[in-house]
Amino acid sequence: MNVVIAFPSAFANTHGLAKAIKRAIPALTSVIIEDSCLVCESTDAVEHASRMTKLFGIDRVAIAKKVSSRFSDLCAEIAKVGTKIVMPGHSFYIRTIIQQSARHDYVSRDVEFAASGMLTARLAAIKAHPAKSEKDAQDFILVVVGQKWAYVCIQMSNAPGGIVAGSQGSVLASIHGPLSLLSCLNAAKGGFELVIMLPYFDEEDLKRNTALAQVFVTKTGTRKQKILATPINVREKGTIALFLREMIISEILNSHSNYNRIVLPLNIAVHPLWMIDLVIREAVSAKKTPFAPLLFMSEELISYAQVVGIQEQEILSETIQAKEDFFRKYSRIIEYEAKVAIKRTKRLDLEVGPNYLHDVIDSI
């Protein structure tokens, strides 16, 4: 029988993660906490492992074969699995993790030594051989020994890490460009459940921003989403328009009384310092707790964006070079447009499906 094993990230609460996995994948037969990992029995290990790689709070995900923890049986099963995953001419390494709660009359090194010997004999014809260390190995076999059963990992995948989604409560954020999308992804990785404000100038802007929101739900594996669709009006063009958009959106975030925490897509390399000071001061003045996940990123911001599929030029296009007197000149317009936008806001509660883009646009 194949199972899915989730290895929690360093700061994840194991019991909270178990609940999050059950909510995200209700089709799982069971979720068992085995000290340093969670073993999930599944009727479709491949599909459920794929979905688990999108969950925050998980560092790695493995599809594993559930086997007997008896020493002789375990070593034989490791060798059997190894013949299927070790490539001809490759070096391999077997690593065994025995959970603290497991009670067996052998230690990790016993399993690794015996199983390596058996596997070497079986793979002699294809000239595969054991490596001296995990670092030197071309193929790696991880074995987890639990309280009752052992698990031989067949396939390993990376997951996003971070803190269990929703464990830090909810936060209000806006998606209206690459920076705001990256801010939302970082906030989600920090354990927040996001209510998304989706501001837009016109139909084309709505399509662009909804496409970015779709990236968010895809990357985070979101199944249900709250959206505040908010039409905004900016008459100016160029740099002034960028500045006014950010200030109006910040004002709207500050004005929503149902949310005490907000995410601000501020970055020291993209926004002038006076603007960052102003936006944060106004948020605090409005009795909000502002979070700015990208604030001090520079070169690493570009690298992170590229991982998500955002190009460097898209980030640079959001650079604002407005002068401080712009705010004094446009402050009344910002306040007025924010009030109008809030009155025209439409709340959506969505079940995220394959037609997400059309579902959002049609609902608005």
Question: Which sequence ranges carry the predicted segments?
Answer:
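Nucleotide-activated chemistry modules centered on ATP-dependent adenylation/adenylyltransferase
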Residues: M1-T53, R122-K132, D136-I364
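Short, hydrophobic/π-rich interface segment
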Residues: Q100-A131
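Accessory substrate-recognition/RNA-binding modules or partner subunits associated with SAM-dependent
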Residues: A10-E112
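Short, contiguous clusters of charged residues that form electrostatic/catalytic patches at enzyme active sites
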Residues: A76, F113, G117, L182, ...
